[in-house]
Amino acid sequence: MVEEQNIHINIIHGHEASEHQIELAHGFYASTFDRKSGIPTLSIGFFREICRTMGEQVVFMFALLENEYIACAITLKGDDALYGRFWGCKKEFHSLHFETCFYQGIDYCIQKKLTTFEPGAQGEHKITRGFLPTKTWSAHWMNDSQFRQAIYTFCEREQEAMHNQCKELLSLSPYRLEE
Protein backbone atom coordinates (compact mmCIF):
# COMPACT_ATOMS: atom_id res chain seq x y z
CA MET A 1 0.00 0.00 0.00
CA VAL A 2 2.74 2.49 0.77
CA GLU A 3 4.34 1.89 -2.64
CA GLU A 4 1.08 3.05 -4.23
CA GLN A 5 1.62 6.36 -2.39
CA ASN A 6 5.17 6.58 -3.81
CA ILE A 7 6.66 5.94 -0.38
CA HIS A 8 9.86 3.94 -0.25
CA ILE A 9 11.58 2.33 2.74
CA ASN A 10 15.31 2.67 3.30
CA ILE A 11 16.91 0.52 5.99
CA ILE A 12 20.03 2.03 7.57
CA HIS A 13 22.13 0.50 10.35
CA GLY A 14 23.51 2.72 13.07
CA HIS A 15 27.10 2.60 11.85
CA GLU A 16 25.95 3.58 8.33
CA ALA A 17 23.76 6.49 9.46
CA SER A 18 24.88 10.01 8.69
CA GLU A 19 24.64 12.72 11.33
CA HIS A 20 21.62 14.05 9.44
CA GLN A 21 19.88 10.65 9.54
CA ILE A 22 20.58 10.28 13.27
CA GLU A 23 19.09 13.72 13.87
CA LEU A 24 16.06 12.81 11.75
CA ALA A 25 15.54 9.54 13.65
CA HIS A 26 15.73 11.38 16.95
CA GLY A 27 13.33 14.03 15.67
CA PHE A 28 10.79 11.41 14.61
CA TYR A 29 11.17 9.68 17.99
CA ALA A 30 10.61 12.97 19.85
CA SER A 31 7.63 13.93 17.66
CA THR A 32 5.65 10.95 18.91
CA PHE A 33 6.12 12.07 22.50
CA ASP A 34 5.31 15.67 21.57
CA ARG A 35 2.01 14.57 19.98
CA LYS A 36 1.07 12.41 22.96
CA SER A 37 2.11 14.92 25.64
CA GLY A 38 4.99 12.79 26.80
CA ILE A 39 8.61 13.52 27.48
CA PRO A 40 11.19 12.12 25.05
CA THR A 41 13.77 10.95 27.57
CA LEU A 42 16.38 9.78 25.05
CA SER A 43 18.64 12.60 23.89
CA ILE A 44 20.24 13.13 20.51
CA GLY A 45 23.51 12.30 22.29
CA PHE A 46 22.09 8.90 23.22
CA PHE A 47 21.17 8.24 19.59
CA ARG A 48 24.66 9.22 18.45
CA GLU A 49 26.23 6.98 21.09
CA ILE A 50 24.23 3.86 20.26
CA CYS A 51 24.93 4.34 16.57
CA ARG A 52 28.64 4.65 17.34
CA THR A 53 28.90 1.81 19.85
CA MET A 54 26.18 -0.62 18.74
CA GLY A 55 26.59 -0.13 14.99
CA GLU A 56 24.71 -2.83 13.12
CA GLN A 57 22.48 -3.57 16.12
CA VAL A 58 20.69 -0.24 15.59
CA VAL A 59 18.30 -0.51 12.64
CA PHE A 60 16.46 2.53 11.30
CA MET A 61 13.61 1.92 8.87
CA PHE A 62 13.18 5.27 7.18
CA ALA A 63 10.20 6.06 4.96
CA LEU A 64 10.80 8.50 2.12
CA LEU A 65 8.36 10.33 -0.12
CA GLU A 66 9.98 11.98 -3.15
CA ASN A 67 13.39 11.71 -1.44
CA GLU A 68 12.11 13.44 1.71
CA TYR A 69 12.27 11.58 5.02
CA ILE A 70 8.73 11.35 6.39
CA ALA A 71 8.89 8.64 9.07
CA CYS A 72 11.15 6.23 10.90
CA ALA A 73 10.85 3.05 12.92
CA ILE A 74 13.73 2.56 15.33
CA THR A 75 14.60 -1.03 16.13
CA LEU A 76 17.38 -2.87 17.92
CA LYS A 77 18.83 -6.18 16.76
CA GLY A 78 19.99 -8.91 19.11
CA ASP A 79 21.69 -12.20 18.27
CA ASP A 80 18.49 -13.83 17.03
CA ALA A 81 15.79 -11.18 17.46
CA LEU A 82 14.68 -7.76 16.30
CA TYR A 83 13.03 -5.49 18.84
CA GLY A 84 10.77 -2.66 17.73
CA ARG A 85 11.01 0.30 20.05
CA PHE A 86 10.13 3.71 18.67
CA TRP A 87 8.29 5.29 15.78
CA GLY A 88 7.64 8.77 14.53
CA CYS A 89 6.37 10.57 11.45
CA LYS A 90 5.93 14.04 9.97
CA LYS A 91 2.49 13.28 8.60
CA GLU A 92 0.12 10.32 8.68
CA PHE A 93 -0.12 8.17 5.56
CA HIS A 94 -2.36 5.15 5.06
CA SER A 95 -0.63 1.97 6.35
CA LEU A 96 2.72 3.73 6.85
CA HIS A 97 2.97 2.88 10.55
CA PHE A 98 2.34 -0.81 9.91
CA GLU A 99 4.69 -0.89 6.93
CA THR A 100 7.63 0.62 8.81
CA CYS A 101 7.00 -0.90 12.24
CA PHE A 102 5.71 -4.36 11.34
CA TYR A 103 6.04 -5.49 7.74
CA GLN A 104 9.57 -4.17 7.27
CA GLY A 105 10.58 -5.73 10.60
CA ILE A 106 9.18 -9.10 9.56
CA ASP A 107 10.94 -8.89 6.21
CA TYR A 108 14.20 -7.88 7.89
CA CYS A 109 13.99 -10.88 10.23
CA ILE A 110 13.43 -13.23 7.30
CA GLN A 111 16.35 -11.75 5.34
CA LYS A 112 18.70 -11.87 8.34
CA LYS A 113 17.40 -15.26 9.54
CA LEU A 114 16.37 -13.86 12.92
CA THR A 115 13.99 -16.18 14.77
CA THR A 116 12.06 -13.59 16.78
CA PHE A 117 10.43 -10.25 16.06
CA GLU A 118 9.09 -8.27 19.01
CA PRO A 119 7.32 -5.24 17.53
CA GLY A 120 7.22 -3.35 20.83
CA ALA A 121 5.04 -2.88 23.85
CA GLN A 122 1.39 -1.92 23.90
CA GLY A 123 -1.15 -1.98 21.15
CA GLU A 124 -4.20 -4.17 20.91
CA HIS A 125 -4.05 -3.36 17.19
CA LYS A 126 -1.12 -5.77 16.90
CA ILE A 127 -3.48 -8.76 17.26
CA THR A 128 -4.86 -8.18 13.75
CA ARG A 129 -1.28 -8.21 12.46
CA GLY A 130 -0.66 -11.64 13.98
CA PHE A 131 1.23 -10.59 17.12
CA LEU A 132 -0.17 -12.27 20.19
CA PRO A 133 0.27 -10.95 23.73
CA THR A 134 3.49 -12.05 25.37
CA LYS A 135 4.08 -11.80 29.08
CA THR A 136 7.24 -9.97 30.03
CA TRP A 137 8.90 -9.31 33.34
CA SER A 138 11.17 -6.70 34.78
CA ALA A 139 12.95 -6.24 38.08
CA HIS A 140 13.27 -2.99 40.01
CA TRP A 141 14.47 -2.04 43.46
CA MET A 142 13.00 0.88 45.38
CA ASN A 143 15.01 2.22 48.28
CA ASP A 144 12.04 3.85 50.03
CA SER A 145 10.11 1.11 51.89
CA GLN A 146 6.75 2.93 51.76
CA PHE A 147 7.09 3.54 48.05
CA ARG A 148 8.21 -0.06 47.58
CA GLN A 149 5.10 -1.34 49.40
CA ALA A 150 2.79 0.89 47.34
CA ILE A 151 4.35 -0.39 44.12
CA TYR A 152 4.12 -3.99 45.32
CA THR A 153 0.41 -3.56 46.11
CA PHE A 154 -0.22 -2.01 42.70
CA CYS A 155 1.69 -4.79 40.93
CA GLU A 156 -0.40 -7.46 42.65
CA ARG A 157 -3.60 -5.82 41.37
CA GLU A 158 -2.11 -5.21 37.96
CA GLN A 159 -1.05 -8.85 37.61
CA GLU A 160 -4.65 -10.08 37.74
CA ALA A 161 -5.81 -7.35 35.34
CA MET A 162 -3.02 -8.22 32.89
CA HIS A 163 -3.88 -11.93 33.08
CA ASN A 164 -7.50 -11.12 32.21
CA GLN A 165 -6.49 -8.77 29.40
CA CYS A 166 -4.13 -11.35 27.86
CA LYS A 167 -6.87 -13.97 28.02
CA GLU A 168 -9.30 -11.60 26.28
CA LEU A 169 -6.76 -10.62 23.62
CA LEU A 170 -5.87 -14.26 22.93
CA SER A 171 -9.56 -14.89 22.21
CA LEU A 172 -9.18 -12.41 19.30
CA SER A 173 -6.24 -14.32 17.81
CA PRO A 174 -6.30 -14.69 14.03
CA TYR A 175 -4.79 -18.15 14.51
CA ARG A 176 -6.63 -21.37 15.15
CA LEU A 177 -5.98 -22.37 18.74
CA GLU A 178 -5.27 -26.04 19.39
CA GLU A 179 -7.20 -27.59 22.24
Q: Where are the language model's segments positioned?
A:
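A conserved beta-strand-loop-helix scaffold within acyl/acetyltransferase catalytic domains
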Residues: 1-94, 141, 156, 173-179
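Terminal substrate-recognition subdomain of acyl/acetyltransferases
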Residues: 1-11, 116, 121-179
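Residue-level detector of functional hotspots within protein domains
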Residues: 47-49, 68, 103-105, 117, ...
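Acyl-donor binding region in acyl/amide transferases
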Residues: 79-145
